[in-house]
Amino acid sequence: MEDFVRQCFNPMIVELAEKAMKEYGEDPKIETNKFAAICTHLEICFMYSDFHFIDERGESIIVESGDPNALLKHRFEIIEGRDRTMAWTVVNSICNTTGVEKPKLLPDLYDYKENRFIEIGVTRREVHIYYLEKANKIKSEKTHIHIFSFTGEEMATKADYTLDEESRARIKTRLFTIRQEMASRGLWDSFVSPREAKRQLKKDLKSQEPCAGLPTKVSHRTSPALKTLEPMWMDSNRTAALRASFLKCQKK
């Protein structure tokens, strides 16, 4: 699984996931399923944000190519992927600026158009079950929840899906691609089932051979959002990073 993750995801996402796990004392080489899950969640958060801007009239627009107008502002502030200290600094700054209620737990994004924090969920189970778990954990009606599954299902607070249908379709396609690529390498069952994961881990520890069939090249294309993980007060420099690129596993 570790080899698959390093081949399938952009190196910057992998690096952020490794830092996040090490911050909590977890080892990506051992807890490989969690490693894959964190990388997936990070990428979906970035895809959620990519190409969405607010114009001078306060309207939400999508810009997919070329350099956006200097008057445009990123619609979403990315909180996920930052270290905890910086993440809370960003959250506090948003709350002080907008007057929104400070969340008890770190959210993933902030939507400047709807003026709300967003919690993104990616699940291998039923979306409604995961949604309820998220809602029970957050315990706040102020934070908007949006859940995606690897089977193309989604669920959001009050059925408000925030993004346009095409943007959400890209996310669903990416998740389906990840699932198919895992399945083709015999990794999906262990990713879904904890019992199977333990069996797979024992098998991996016995074998030091590289995973057969993995692509030998890594895509170094970078999502626009990956280039914008600086403090929000540097927002004026963010627009230059816009490049149309969505990450996909390379074909075998």
Curated annotation (Swiss-Prot):
The record marks 195, 198-199 as: Important for efficient shutoff activity and nuclear localization. GO terms for biological process: viral RNA genome replication; viral translational frameshifting. Its main location: host cell. InterPro entries: PA/PA-X, PA/PA-X_sf. The keyword Transmembrane does not apply. GO terms for molecular function: RNA binding. It holds the Pfam family Flu_PA. Plays a major role in the shutoff of the host protein expression by cleaving mRNAs probably via an endonuclease activity. This host shutoff allows the virus to escape from the host antiviral response. Hijacks host RNA splicing machinery to selectively target host RNAs containing introns for destruction. This may explain the preferential degradation of RNAs that have undergone co- or post-transcriptional processing. It is found in: Host cytoplasm; Host nucleus. This is Protein PA-X. Belongs to the influenza viruses PA-X family. The probable endonuclease active site in the N-terminus and the basic amino acid cluster in the C-terminus are important for the shutoff activity. The C-terminus acts as a nuclear localization signal. The C-terminus is recruited to host protein complexes involved in nuclear Pol II RNA processing. The active site is at 80, 108. Keywords: Decay of host mRNAs by virus, Eukaryotic host gene expression shutoff by virus, Host cytoplasm, Host gene expression shutoff by virus, Host mRNA suppression by virus, Host nucleus, Host-virus interaction. The record marks 202-203, 206 as: Important for efficient shutoff activity.
